[in-house]
Amino acid sequence: LKALPLHHELWYEIDDIQDLDIAESIFAEDTITPIASRYGGYWRYPHILDYCYLVNPYFPNSRLLAEIKANFERLISQYPSGVRVNSLLAGKNFNIKPEYVVVGNGAAELIKSIMENMEGKIGITLPTFEEYPNRRDKTTVVSFIPSNPDFSYTAQDLKTHFADKDISALLLINPDNPSGNFIGFNEVLDLCEWTQKKGIRFILDESFVDFTDESVHNTLLRNDILEKYNHLIILKSISKSYGVPGLRLGILATSDPLVIGRTKQDIAIWNINSFAEFYMQIYGKYETDYQKACLRFIEERDYLKKQLEAIPWLRVIPS
């Protein structure tokens, strides 16, 4: 066994194929591409600071994590519940009827189901969260690109652009990802009304709505709205603002029984693991803490915005 003295050289011990895979990404000339192409698992790189995934650093708190840790052995050794129970838990947490909601293995699983089963063409604002257009044939995507440097747009802009387009569905991510554009409650409701009259399915992604000021007043995730607008499908990731991307949780909500039934057929009976289910089971005890965490996040965002605006050579895009 030989040993070599090292001073400032970068090194990595390789004992198996996994070590080799990690080393190849560390020592590559272009380190960003091989690491980014992993789409996660960045605990393997303890010195990396990940600014790509928009996750709330203030939630879950230590008490919630302690409760999960205390139940670790029981959770890892038992099967989770099936689809019906998970819909019940999600309905309780979001105060909507269980029959209106499907829980997915992250919002990505639900996006895949909706996008691949949607007939006709779909209107999408660009730039966007790529999981949506990536699940469609490019010929079925009708795009709208805002003609301003901030990538900002209103509900009226969407209505004007798509009024004469042959689309069967319209996607709105609100707040948008990655632009941060936000459309207020009344405007979104007006867009929902417009799509209903036009016979267009309205897909609304509210994954980031809890990061908005007065977020409780900005969501359409309500029984009365879902029941009035049968064409409305709401998607929400339980990763971003909830700070638990590793649990892989997301919900789809609609009063359309055909969409609910088709989505449930697409997912596996045990698509959610025991830890994710337990999180939904105990979340209600920590809801006040979650709301405080979101307020703290908003304060930090406002502070960051002011600090960036003080730099003369930066143009800060409203978000």
Feature map (PLM): residue ranges:
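N-terminal "arm"/small-domain region of PLP-dependent enzymes with the aminotransferase-like
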Residues: 22-78, 165-166
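Catalytic donor-sugar/metal-binding loop of nucleotide-sugar-dependent glycosyltransferases
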Residues: 1-6
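Short, conserved phosphate/pyrophosphate- and ester-handling motifs at nucleotide-, phospho-/glycolipid
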Residues: 16
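Active-site pre-lysine segment of PLP-dependent enzymes
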Residues: 152-165, 178-241
